[in-house]
Amino acid sequence: MQFMLMHRDVPVLQFAIFDERNWVEIVDVLNAAHVPVNMLVQPHNRERALNEFIDHRFIPQSRSNYDVIKALYKANDAFELSLRSYMVSISDHYWVKPCDSSVTWADVNFYDNPIPDDQVLIGAIDTLHQYDPWRRTPNTSNNGTLRQIWLHRGDEILLSKAGELTFKQEPFNEAVVSDILAYFDVPYITYYLDYM
């Protein structure tokens, strides 16, 4: 099957998936000025760079609740999970659609469209029997080993992460570093601790 990598509503390139989703192959670059940054820094190996870019739009198998998420969404693998929401990420404006699809950025982005309450993905609530496995969410495109979800709180989009292992120290570390950077008045992203 062939897909289009989009940057908002700009068609960037067309690609095909081979080897049971283990490799994507570029069919045609339509707008080189809009390729992802990692493809610009690897100009002689664009296909490998595209595969790395696509791979970073999946929930990794190393995430502690990977199998639970697959079961919840009735998906075979992380690729299928991510593709259901067009591989939209909150971190950038790229997304993927089938070449014959008329879907637009306005239809799929989560800056302007609601983000579903996915707290079940980090174990904060236990309502699996009420969960719609076919709804679109940016949380099936989150890379990283920590359990995490994007959510709307008022006018803000926040990333909520859960700690792992015995001390659950990762969220604490990020909050402390955020405070240190604020003290030194350098650009940073604010992290704070909350309990869910």
List each language-model region with its residue ranges:
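Regulatory N- and C-terminal appendages and interdomain linkers associated
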Residues: 1-135
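Conserved ATP-binding subdomain of kinase catalytic cores across diverse folds
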Residues: 107-196
